[in-house]
A protein has these predicted regions:
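Glycan-recognition and catalytic cores of secretory/periplasmic carbohydrate-active enzymes
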Residues: 1-430
Length: 430
């Protein structure tokens, strides 16, 4: 992205898109129901389904920033798949359509990116039907057919295939088709959260298919493996693979708490994670497993967030969530030890480790709502990031839910207003 946020970096990473889906879904649920957020989520998931989902159900890793203009080009050019020459737009569209498009997007004869136009909105808001129809015309130029006729777009897996295969539209960027557990898990979390809010069946289908692929295919000799190339798992998993996968499973459980399938998987994977990565002496998780670090001078325990969250930040929050869902306080003790291990960093450089701060929020304010399944349709779409849900039929007379924090519980809530007030009071009490 440039300094003015006009031109994006055109490379599309799975981990970026998974995080933005979750973030926008949370924004929507936090009393910010801006239609542009929902449109961005919808468009991202459509792209994911169309271009980044393998027939087996997992998600590809990335798409290149550049692509070939034609089969005779020696080198690919950045952003050509997405950018528009002014003369090209003038030939594709009627004069009225071009005028309408210019009223919504910055479009000039000189362009804003190497002489071409990257379509940037003048302002937000809902696009009109007329503008959507014009954008569909441009989609057809890119892909050779309309969106409704293009459910899947097979990837170009290398430059040779990109240049030599017959494409109905423009030559697409090359797609890295390997499966990475950590990156898939970030997208699964985003889809799970979006499903909890919008109840779109496709979000759940995509999330659970990818998850099931990992559960069915990424274990060899009882160990999780990080990568999959064309159906073959390889490379022992790192701490982020375990942490993000466990979070994804917990997010699926949160989106559909009526069954414990995902929670049962979490418990087993957490045990494996602890066995090979947990620092008994210091607390926290090493980046590499015990049996895959013989050549390392130092076994590091990363805490900084970068393009993806820190494994330790996510893992500690997972432990707190697990404690609330299972009533196993050993998980809570682990979380406390890990937070203590990173306490100096939290005090001195909090801006470097926002995921650890989120984990601290879970530890201090995390709560569990015990309720009947009928109330979940109301609770799950709410922005309650440190709340877990347990299904129970054993509620006192007239009660709809019981809110518990740690070993103590509040008085049974008899209506939704009382329940929401209790949850708010817990997060503001300290």
């Amino acid at each position: 992205v440039d300094a003015t946020w006009t031109v994006p970096h055109f490379e599309k990473m799975l981990y970026d898109n998974g995080q933005i889906v979750e973030y926008l879904a949370n924004l929507w649920s936090a009393n910010q129901p801006n239609p542009i957020f929902q449109r961005a989520i919808t468009g991202t998931v459509q792209w994911l389904q169309r271009e980044m989902t393998a027939p087996e159900g997992y998600f590809y890793a990335s798409q290149d920033a550049d692509n070939f203009i034609d089969s005779q080009a020696l080198e690919p050019e950045e952003g050509d798949f997405y950018a528009w020459d002014y003369q090209e737009l003038a030939e594709l569209l009627t004069a009225d359509e071009l005028t309408q498009l210019q009223s919504v997007f910055y479009i000039t004869a000189t362009g804003n990116f190497d002489g071409k136009n990257v379509l940037q909105r003048h302002q937000g808001g809902v696009l009109s039907t007329e503008i959507e129809e014009i954008l569909t015309k441009l989609f057809v130029v890119r892909y050779g057919t309309s969106p409704e006729n293009l459910l899947t777009f097979p990837p170009a897996i290398n430059n040779e295939e990109a240049k030599n295969k017959h494409w109905a539209g423009r030559i697409p960027p090359v797609t890295d088709t390997k499966m990475i557990v950590a990156w898939n898990s970030l997208m699964i979390s985003g889809l799970a959260r979006a499903y909890a809010i919008f109840s779109t069946p496709m979000y759940w289908t995509l999330a659970t298919q990818a998850t099931q692929f990992i559960l069915d295919h990424q274990w060899q000799e009882n160990r999780l493996h990080r990568l999959n190339y064309q159906g073959k798992p390889t490379t022992l998993a790192q701490s982020e693979d375990y942490a993000f996968l466990i979070k994804a499973l917990l997010d699926l459980q949160t989106a559909n708490p009526t069954e414990n399938y995902w929670l049962e998987k979490v418990i087993a994977i957490q045990e494996e994670f602890d066995q090979f990565f947990w620092s008994v002496e210091l607390g926290g998780y090493y980046n590499n497993s015990l049996d895959n670090s013989q050549d390392l001078l130092i076994r590091e325990r990363s805490y900084q967030d970068n393009a993806t969250p820190s494994a330790n930040g996510i893992a500690i929050a997972n432990l707190v969530r697990l404690a609330g869902l299972t009533d196993n306080l050993d998980y809570l003790a682990q979380a406390e030890q890990a937070l203590t291990a990173f306490s100096y960093v939290l005090k001195q450089s909090p801006q470097a480790c926002p995921s650890l701060l989120v984990a601290l929020d879970h530890y201090r304010f995390g709560n569990t709502v015990r309720t009947q399944s009928e109330l979940l349709n109301t609770l799950c779409p709410q922005y309650l990031p440190v709340t877990r849900y347990q299904i129970t039929e054993n509620l006192p007379n007239r009660a709809i839910a019981i809110v518990c924090q740690g070993l103590s519980c509040l008085e049974p809530a008899i209506n939704q207003e009382q329940l929401m007030n209790q949850l708010q009071s817990l997060t503001l009490s300290e």
